[in-house]
């Protein structure tokens, strides 16, 4: 078996270490309405189309109960759209600062391309958001061969449509000749639903939720415990393999090509 393409997520996988761009914005739009949500809650739906992310937050039992306490009723679809419009406005203003490629990504991409492997990408950001992120990332040396956003297909993650569109545009089939790499549970589900080899990256991920400084300064035992929690979460949601950093990806690829991993 030969791997012919790798499909990467963006924030938390290839750019924006820790996936912090959307986090505080999600928290802020709820806080403005007197409903406090935690960073852990805000991260849980990460990877979804952002309006679906807002909707998923309103459906969490604790948040829904707090909203009902404040407003006397559960959030409506109008509330969701109002918050999403605010989310977009704030996010657009900060996105250029959160498009820096994560350490090691550019080198791994270059190595994959030397092997003739095509580079695709999917995201939970809209096309308009990605015009900002992709442009800034390209200026800093990261540009995949193709990008698909939820706007380009009938639905975003966990549906497989963005991966399928990448496969068509890159001219690669069958799907088990491709790897999906991401940093969220929804990435794992997207890859598995598409019939692809699916790999979760841990350091810099939304699931780990730490800055690079926090990772580097944390007690090694505590950090290892957190890494293993994320590793298990990825495995429970379909990851065929996990890597701590992108530099380990080619090693996983070699195991796949030697048929030392089994797709199921």
From Swiss-Prot:
One Pfam match: Hydrolase
Keywords: Hydrolase, Magnesium, Metal-binding, Schiff base
Any one GO CC term of the record: cytosol
KW tRNA processing (keyword) present: no
CDD domains for the chain: HAD_PHN
Co-factor binding details: Binds 1 Mg(2+) ion per subunit.
Residues at the active site: 9 (nucleophile), 50 (schiff-base intermediate with substrate)
InterPro entries (alphabetical): HAD-like_hydrolase_sf, HAD-like_sf, HAD-SF_hydro_IA, HAD_sf, PGP-like_dom2, Phosphonoacetald_hydro
EC number assigned by the record: 3.11.1.1
Record: residues binding Mg(2+): 9, 11, 183
Catalytic activity line of the entry: phosphonoacetaldehyde + H2O = acetaldehyde + phosphate + H(+)
GO MF, one example: phosphoglycolate phosphatase activity
GO biological process, one term: organic phosphonate catabolic process
Subunit structure: Homodimer.
PANTHER family documented for this protein: PHOSPHOGLYCOLATE PHOSPHATASE, PHOSPHONOACETALDEHYDE HYDROLASE
Main function: Involved in phosphonate degradation.
UniProt xrefs under HAMAP family: PhnX
Family indicated by similarity: Belongs to the HAD-like hydrolase superfamily. PhnX family.
Name the record gives this protein: Phosphonoacetaldehyde hydrolase
Organism: Bacillus cereus (strain ATCC 14579 / DSM 31 / CCUG 7414 / JCM 2152 / NBRC 15305 / NCIMB 9373 / NCTC 2599 / NRRL B-3711)
